């Protein structure tokens, strides 16, 4: 719709979708760039699935569903139907791409890796995965699987699927313990990155609110002269966590 909208209305629509970062100087160019990135990743995912043995109908559907973090499958038992480690790996990559801010993806394609490493929201995303995967691995080993490799494989896939709010599965969710399902639900609630196709609260919002909370605590208990203004890095540069910015993050 941004390709046909213009002026203030286009900017309002763009902001309402959660895309705070422009990839190009104007919104129409930004929309075209986002569309090209999306089409490119979808085509690459479809080709990868096809090479790994999926028929082209399944390949296209799963590539679109993984990248859009929609999680729709042509099979009743989702990705478990294929029982393929390589297909699961491709799906994980597509889900990770889908849950990442489009502006960050643009920086990634430009090779600006040092800039990307500054983004605290990505560090939080990695921390959540590093924390949840061992928990699910241990629980899966205790309940379902007989060896560590299979349990780890399932834990990695389910963690990424839940945190990206995709919903693909390689296990029967009804066989999981209540604590495992609770962890997966929490991951879904946290959700993916702002400006991505993922749902949930968004881990980028969680990161900003956490930093704002820490800053508020420091201001209350430490001398004002030693408390520096809190900030976060976004694709457009350093953003200071002002009261207005935190309020906007909290509302949308």
Language-model regions: role of each:
Residues 1-252:
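Membrane-proximal intracellular helices of multi-pass ion channels
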